């Protein structure tokens, strides 16, 4: 979710949208072509199989498509990175990265960073991080992971540092004996790496982040503070800490939550489906003291995720069935309606069916 002077830009269902901040209006695809149906690839707003992340640099948006294209010279499958003009007048491919089953990417300090999944002959895989220029002409490997068969949960620029969080096994797994592997007893760990592009300095597991055993993720960034989620497997609870952007800033404990918690002004919220009643799904909002402020009914939607929040809105993502096909949807919850218990989920996008965007 990218704020602008006159509204917000966001990526949903393979399209870039603009929303002017009026809850009585829907978001519209970022395309200035007259009479465009926004359903074909010549639409400026449409990026086929777009990843869920979008970045703005100068007058353009950078979006990775995970739909691979075959290189006419080498035959190698490559995933294109598109640059879309911020007025919706056009788009172009500025770079490509090799096709991979799992990929993370980000744009930070005028460089593109992405992960590569390196498959070994013994069936294990490891991750590496690569840096690419914005025009796609220069690229180099800057990091090689030392864990096996895991995942990268964070690749994100924050302040002056690029954050890389990797989880995996400390030793190669014998996949030839897979039926007898006790996965719970494998020596696994999570490492946090910080990279400073100017000095090309790497820091591994800085002390400021060693607050709990397992760092799940950098949950969200809110007003120059980083919210970190750790998991206590014994208590089956998530513990949240916060710290400033400066590396030396001491982290402070926020609280314990049963599910992913999202910082929102002076409140915290998380989705909470009722597992005893499949017809119930809620977004619960609490104050600093743990008091319930409002419980917003999200049914019939499920698998809802809060993707961003500012002083006015929380932006919500979910999958909605339409004509037998799952459609990605974005909605908002108004911050100022919570005090009066009038907040509700407002849908901003519809499916890509012909004229569904007409007013």
Positions of the model-derived regions?
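Repeated scaffold domains used in trafficking and secretory/extracellular systems
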Residues: 1-4, 40-57, 99-109, 147-159, ...
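Short loop/turn segments that connect beta-strands within the blades of beta-propeller domains
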Residues: 4, 12-13, 23, 57-58, ...
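Residue position within the beta-strands of beta-propeller blades
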Residues: 10-11, 62-65, 113-116, 163-166, ...
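Surface-exposed loop/turn elements that mediate protein-protein interactions on large endomembrane-trafficking
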Residues: 15-42, 70-97, 120-145, 173-211, ...
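Intrinsically disordered, low-complexity prosegments and terminal tails associated
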Residues: 49, 53, 68-69, 166-171, ...
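Extracytoplasmic/periplasmic C-terminal soluble domains
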Residues: 113, 141-158, 163, 167-168
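N-terminal leader/targeting helix
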Residues: 215-220, 226-232, 237-238
């Amino acid at each position: 979710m990218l704020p602008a002077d006159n509204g917000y830009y966001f990526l949903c269902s393979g399209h870039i949208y603009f929303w002017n901040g009026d809850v009585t209006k829907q978001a519209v695809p970022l395309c200035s072509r007259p009479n465009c149906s926004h359903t074909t690839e010549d639409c400026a707003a449409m990026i086929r199989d777009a990843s869920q992340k979008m970045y703005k640099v100068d007058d353009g948006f950078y979006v990775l498509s995970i739909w691979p294209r075959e290189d006419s010279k080498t035959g190698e499958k490559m995933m294109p990175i598109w640059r879309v003009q911020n007025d919706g007048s056009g788009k172009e491919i500025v770079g490509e990265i090799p096709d991979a089953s799992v990929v993370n990417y980000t744009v930070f300090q005028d460089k593109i960073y992405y992960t590569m999944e390196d498959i070994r002959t013994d069936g294990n895989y490891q991750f590496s991080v690569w840096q690419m220029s914005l025009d796609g002409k220069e690229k180099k490997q800057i990091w090689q992971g030392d864990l096996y068969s895991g995942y990268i949960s964070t690749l994100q620029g924050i302040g002056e540092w690029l954050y890389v969080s990797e989880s995996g096994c400390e030793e190669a797994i014998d996949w030839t004996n897979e039926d007898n592997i006790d996965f719970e007893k494998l020596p696994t760990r999570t490492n946090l790496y910080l990279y400073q592009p100017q000095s090309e300095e790497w820091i591994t597991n800085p002390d400021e982040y060693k607050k709990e055993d397992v760092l799940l993720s950098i949950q969200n960034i809110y007003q120059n503070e980083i919210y970190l989620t750790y998991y206590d497997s014994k208590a089956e609870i998530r513990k949240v800490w916060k710290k400033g952007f400066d590396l030396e800033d001491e982290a402070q404990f926020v609280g314990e939550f049963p599910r992913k918690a999202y910082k929102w002004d002076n409140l915290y919220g998380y989705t909470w489906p009722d597992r005893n009643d499949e017809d119930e799904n809620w977004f619960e909002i609490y104050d600093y003291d743990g008091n319930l402020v409002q419980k917003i009914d999200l049914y019939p939607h499920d698998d809802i995720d809060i993707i961003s929040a500012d002083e006015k809105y929380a932006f919500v993502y979910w999958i909605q069935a339409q004509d037998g096909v799952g459609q990605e949807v974005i909605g908002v919850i108004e911050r100022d309606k919570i005090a009066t218990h009038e907040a509700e989920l407002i849908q901003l996008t519809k499916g890509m069916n012909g004229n569904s965007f007409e007013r």
